[in-house]
């Protein structure tokens, strides 16, 4: 079977990448930008780094900031109405996954108005038209939403997150500039970085993995393992490594899928507003152990990429343990909690387990879980 790979038309990487935004806008004949960015980025003048460039070149824009950390159906609906009134012809998404996901949903609904209820786009979205052109400017090194065909929206009423997968939503241009990530506090750097590591490890071991996505994901594991500690301390080398590593795994997992770490984490975000990266980081080692017998020798590769020495001489049991231990050590070093005791209420475990079973990421897991197994995984983390 042929493997499909979908990537940005164009991407810019490295310090100063955002300086190419105005040139790209002019080359494409765009007239007015709908700048989608969350309130904190506006408050701390991160968004201003981009709007100053637009101002300098006399390019029009309008800012939309009704975005929550876990974007909701309401955020999307109000964004669609704001875009219609703005007269904009492209979107500049500035931020982490929240801004990117909101932008994708808005852009898709604008060009596919028959799907005005974003819930109708869950799973493999049946759209026919490419979304409003998006320029993506990530400010976190984690979600890689600037290069993926996925977006996640929270249904507050039903207390669940749902994943939409649509080749029509990928940003046309990504500007991956580590300078845009330098204002991230340590905690956010750690959680988004562990989100990226989860993408890479799940992507490398998912059922849909192939030789191309493996190349992206394995190199991403190596870069993230080398760079995250430095990024948390805000070193230039660490920021640069994370910017590239998280983008590489975006190129990978977007084209092969994820697994039950994300299925379980989505429920925590919807029910408790738990930061997505924190939820992933806590769950990842336990799910790696659960999946260990279903992924062949891939955990040997993971252990080596994580920096473990002597993996070629290790027994199967040794390299599996080494891979899990290396992930646990990195998570501990960057300050991630070890368990879900302070997050999950015992009475919610059944609901969370069923949510994970219903999640779009679950079928890609290398081992097919039953409800009781998911429940046991949650309980083991409490």
Where are each of the predicted segments found?
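Glycine/threonine-rich beta-strand-loop-alpha-helix active-site module
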Residues: 74-179
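C-terminal charged capping/lid subdomain of soluble metabolic enzymes
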Residues: 299, 309-382
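N-terminal small/polar loop signature for handling phosphorylated ligands or for N-terminal nucleophile
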Residues: 42-115, 229-239
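Catalytic phosphate/nucleotide-handling subdomain of diverse soluble enzymes
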Residues: 267-306
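Carboxylate- and glycine-rich phosphate/diphosphate-binding segment that chelates Mg2+/Mn2+
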Residues: 150-256
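An N-terminal, well-structured beta->alpha segment
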Residues: 1-64
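Short glycine/serine/threonine-rich phosphate/pyrophosphate-binding segments
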Residues: 18-21, 43-46, 73-76, 99-103, ...
């Amino acid at each position: 079977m042929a493997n499909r790979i979908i990537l940005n038309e164009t991407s810019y990487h490295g310090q100063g990448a955002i300086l190419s935004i105005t040139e790209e806008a002019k080359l494409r004949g765009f007239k007015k930008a709908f700048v989608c960015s969350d309130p904190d980025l506006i408050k701390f003048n991160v968004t201003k780094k981009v709007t100053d460039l637009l101002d300098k070149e006399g390019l029009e824009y309008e800012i939309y900031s009704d975005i929550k950390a876990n974007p909701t159906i309401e955020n999307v609906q109000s964004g669609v109405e704001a875009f219609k009134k703005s007269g904009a012809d492209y979107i500049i998404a500035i931020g982490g996954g929240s801004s990117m996901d909101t932008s994708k949903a808005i852009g898709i609904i604008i060009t596919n108005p028959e799907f005005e209820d974003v819930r109708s786009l869950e799973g493999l979205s049946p759209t026919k038209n490419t979304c409003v052109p998006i320029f993506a400017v990530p400010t976190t090194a984690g979600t890689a939403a600037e290069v993926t065909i996925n977006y996640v929206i929270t249904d507050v009423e039903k207390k669940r997150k749902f994943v939409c997968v649509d080749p029509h939503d990928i940003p046309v241009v990504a500007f991956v500039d580590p300078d845009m990530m330098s204002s991230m506090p340590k905690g956010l750097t750690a959680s988004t970085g562990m989100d990226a590591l989860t993408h890479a490890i799940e992507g490398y071991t998912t059922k849909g993995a192939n030789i191309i996505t493996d190349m992206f994901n394995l190199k991403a594991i190596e870069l993230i393992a080398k760079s995250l500690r430095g990024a948390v301390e805000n070193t230039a080398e660490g920021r640069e490594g994370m910017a590239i590593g998280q983008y590489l795994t975006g190129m990978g997992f977007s084209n092969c899928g994820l697994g039950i770490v994300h299925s379980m984490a989505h429920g925590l975000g919807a029910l408790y507003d738990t930061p997505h990266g924190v939820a992933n980081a806590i769950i990842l080692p336990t799910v790696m152990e659960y999946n260990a017998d279903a992924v062949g020798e891939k955990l040997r590769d993971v252990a080596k990429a994580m920096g473990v020495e002597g993996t070629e001489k290790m027994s199967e049991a040794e390299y599996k343990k080494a891979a899990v231990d290396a992930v646990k050590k990195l998570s501990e070093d960057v300050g991630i909690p070890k368990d879900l005791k302070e997050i999950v209420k015992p009475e919610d475990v059944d609901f969370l387990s069923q949510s994970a079973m219903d999640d779009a990421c679950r079928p890609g897991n290398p081992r097919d879980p039953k409800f009781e197994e998911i429940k046991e995984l949650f309980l083991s983390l409490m």
